[in-house]
């Protein structure tokens, strides 16, 4: 449910601010002693958050960064939605929060009862009866459980069956408990179907002995991407009494092998004598390498001493892993729903990228060859256009070991695939989305020390990407707009430009230019740090290329503001649509957004952006209009739903803040960057109301943990608004106390007495390790030392206080020489 708004507390007027600050200083002398994380912290996660509307999360079981997931399949392309009325099966591969069709659900398994044979309940003479849409089971939400590492649901068809799932990194387990005490219970293993709109191109299934089924399936995935193969193995805890396979021609009792082609039915059934036990446990594993990889993974994580691990043991191991991961961040304050929302966000931020190498270290690279990761983990599934904005930084902050291996993985992709990725899916590049997200992503990894020992290799790959384009025969698109960008300073807007995937940069020339400039500025800082002075200077200048697409004459008719980014054509002219009028609210030239929303994507050059908007006062007014600031301050609990963009795919004909998509995620902190941090606090508090303990409790697609990571940073009071800079902007925390174990032996401690997520509160002052801290930001070098941050909060906005002086604002690396914020 959504949190019930509470009446605003009456601001205290009995103690002056100095007295409150003195009290805070006294508190700083005592050590922070947050209670240890609860032993059942995994139960504070609600995996159903994001499973309704378009959050596109999955409710089933996964380990942190797991290779395998077990979750229900319904009628949606991402797997299952909370309001689906049937479960078609339990798939074994899912992405969390992605917004493209053709994804996941491979190896659809469902327990059923009834007769299988000629003329039976499952008539082997009719292949259509083995379609998982036809045999899908009804179910009930009553008693349904979605915890970190554990899922349970009651199937109400077939006499009633309890289905449970748990997962370790490379192996999973399902337990099916039938209500019937006699007759046969069957497990259908469907390899010819997966999630809705995810076509199986070819599949093979083999029944081995009386306990095993294994095989492979080839799918073409993610918005028309390249095909790839998933191998699987399932072992049961007791022998099946009968078996068979089905294919295009129907079912064959007793058959052990079936191979079918594109979109053809294919699978196997295994029959168990329920008089000998009502429960059947299946332990499964998958691999993207080969059949032996799936077997190796099952032996390594689903067995011990040659015997299958029991379901309960695997659940214990899975949830112990989650308990440790979740316990690295501890919060105090708020209510039960606040804690659930927070820890569910931590959970979702740690699902991806997914482990890509098998237990023996082997993985399938972007050259389709087999490689080995010795002593490190190779990862797969990188939604970089999304994750470079918040999730990458969250992992670097809390899991530096994972961040290091992610960096190593991206360099392996570059080495084996010939170029750096943008949206990597399994072992291929999809070329989904636009811009140059890999550059700020990797520069942040460098900034956070995750590329240590590989800085030179990373620089070479990033420089090649920034100054060139992949060859035509490469799957990678890279910066496809570079030919005009390097020559003229902007990406041409050309809807006819040939694409290597669904997206290509010139189709969205306006936003691509802004993304390139942001990336160049980030890379300039890396070049400077590595001693490449000439490249640093060139890239720094290119970091101001957002100005090349800023048209000072464009006027928004309704609000009266003048000057917006606008796409340009090959001849250098401003793009003008057929009707002769360009609107900054239109769809022309910007990817999943409008010029109104993209105008803020120049945070690397705040003085220049403010100058383009006619000064700080006008920039502030424009932000006020963008966020509906008057409405937010009047009704912070509800204004976001009334005033901002609501639909997750309502990209165009908009001028307000869109909390459902990535281009705007940093924009609340533009207020802070121009010296109005109290307004950042108001926007962030209003936006947090959109994250609730409910199936629709995330904003838009969660995008592999991106929205969840945004929420986490918003809740603890620091945010990385300028990629590549290492600057974390400070704002009002949601919780009174926070501790973050940073993976380097140090702990970040945050103290905000009186923090209340249902009230507008503003920062009156900050202390770092007991010393007054006037700047509105903290550098990564200081943050990684594990300081104690103390926030003094008040209900009154300090329009002349903390964070309002220009000297206390971070310097924009790519501001023009001599420019100042005015």
Which role fits each region the language model picked out?
Residues 36-392, 396-440, 446-514, 521, ...:
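Accessory carbohydrate-recognition regions in carbohydrate-active enzymes
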Residues 20-31:
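Bacterial N-terminal signal peptides
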Residues 1-17:
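N-terminal secretory signal peptides that target proteins for export/translocation
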